[in-house]
Amino acid sequence: MVDTYPTTRVRRSPFYEATVADGLTAATTYNHMVLPMSYGDPEAEYRRLTEGVSMWDVGCQRQVEVRGPDAARLAQILCPRHLTHCAVGQGKYVPVCNHRGTVINDPVVLRVDEECFWFSIADSDMGLWASCVAAERGLDVQVTEPEIGRAHV
């Protein structure tokens, strides 16, 4: 049995109740969300991964959406990899760096449309960083976190 308490600091994915029903015994926090870690029998989990099928709740792999007339400009400012040839529907693995060039995240960026990019982030507050950079540059963009729940097989 897993006891978690509702809070705005740690969210649950749309699959949380199903993972608990399937026997979740341990969890951690990742991207301010519950990340299932164990179902109580590591050997059985290993066999499911190597000999069968395992379904994982990875709703904690969040997106940061950058949308607006300056979305492409902000996306390019955030990462040193050239995105000028990133077509709609195309994704690229990119480092995201701070002002000193230190890598602060390594997401996959997807160009959703001409004025929208999604950064599929690792465990960090990249949305805050992107919002700050957009504000300091006076860019016409909105930085949000779209509600996307994902599960992997």
Question: Residue ranges of each PLM-predicted region?
Answer:
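Acidic, low-complexity central loop/insert segments
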Residues: 105-150
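Acidic, proline/glycine-enriched N-terminal capping motif
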Residues: 1-97, 102
